Amino acid sequence: MKQTPIDPKLIDSLVGELGINDFAKATIREVKLVAARAEKQSGVEFIKMEMGIPGLPAAKVGVEAQMKALGNGIANLYPDIQGLPELKNEASRFVKAFIGIDIAPEGCVPVCGSMQGTFASFLTCSQADSKKDTVLFIDPGFPVQKMQLQVMGVKYETFDVYSYRGERLGEKLESYLKQGNICAIVYSNPNNPSWICLNEEELKTIGQLATQYDAIVMEDLAYFAMDFRRDLSKPFLPPYQPTVGRYTDNYILLISGSKAFSYRSEEHTSELQS
């Protein structure tokens, strides 16, 4: 047996203790719990990447701006129902600077965490057309999103992208879309937990099929610009963060401020709609 840092028997016993039938299908929280117990029992430290916790020091300009806003009494007010113009305008500018596409400020919707953004988006997509009652996930993805659909009573389909990269993706995707019941297509790019990135051709395929079959793409950009094979950090200069938004008008982008800016704060996630 190959030597590993952690005895496989320890992991197997922990998986059994926690009642996990198939570890390959374990949730993020289950994986974290197994890792925490294995770390405690073995004394071997784990590098934990499963929860996507920011961790880097928050930008000074953000901290100072938040303190100033609190000092000016913002904490006792609800924001305008149309959204704070400064935030919506800057969100639009951010998208132009780092994704290279145009989204009007009216289409930039600040939400209390990406989970709230996906919940609201699922509600909208699943009720837009009575004939389209199913959400399609290009996995692996965020298990909580499927739990949200279960709470709503919305059906979903799923397939693992691993075996359908490149040209094979279009055929697989169309096999679902041509049934006529798919209201939305969901994926994350860069992907957590597999850390793969869909390329421009794959995004083009998704976008064109979404237009053809009138489905809405929900592109989760929680790990925004974290494909470090290219420098995506220069505003208003290519290369930009890849997005399906170049290939269809039927899309919603979900950008996590806590991850993109390492600024957890009171939640600064934006939902961006074309």
Please name every model-derived segment:
Residues 4-8, 17-116, 120:
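N-terminal small-domain helix-loop-helix segment of the aminotransferase-like
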Residues 6-13, 186:
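Short, basic/glycine-rich phosphate-binding loops at helix/coil junctions
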Residues 54, 189-193, 259:
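Short glycine-rich anion-binding loops that position phosphate/pyrophosphate groups of nucleotides
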Residues 60-61, 197-201, 265:
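Generic recognition of short, well-ordered alpha-helical segments
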Residues 71-213, 218, 224-248, 252:
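Conserved core of the PLP fold type I
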Residues 223-224, 260:
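Residues immediately C-terminal
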